[in-house]
């Protein structure tokens, strides 16, 4: 079975998840926005949180949306304002996950993401959602990925 992890990481938490899943045999694709985030962490939180709150999509640099060679696709996103990040909103709009076994890995400062989980379960009934509390700060959270 071929498995793919598509993810966005702004602070490095997603990169740790990607390394862990790659060691489990996943192919990995990191998405990068065309526009750089603000340098100020406060502005990143304010602008990203607002944009995620309204479901904004962000143009991506060189994103390959073709997942036809994969049986299972796992999407990784930081949680912004209790929602998926804007780059991952774009991934979900561009990527055909029909006939795939989608699963999601969310990395949240609080370790919970009920709003994001609810939206994902509505859009992808039966999809697996794993929420991690900041893997950079709490590396033991990565053990939850063994369930994928």
State where each predicted segment sits.
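N-terminal beta1-alpha1-beta2 submodule of the flavodoxin-like/Rossmannoid cofactor-binding fold
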Residues: 1-73, 82, 86-89, 93, ...
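Short beta-alpha junction loops
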Residues: 106-112, 135
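Short glycine-rich anion-binding loops that position phosphate/pyrophosphate groups of nucleotides
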Residues: 78-81, 109
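Short, charged, surface-exposed secondary-structure boundary motifs
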Residues: 37-42, 114-115, 136-142
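Glycine-rich, charge-decorated loop segments at or immediately adjacent to ligand/cofactor-binding or catalytic sites
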Residues: 110-123
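Short, conserved loop/helix-junction motifs that constitute active-site signature segments
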Residues: 67-68, 93-100, 122-124
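Glycine-rich phosphate/pyrophosphate-binding loop and the adjoining helix
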Residues: 128-148
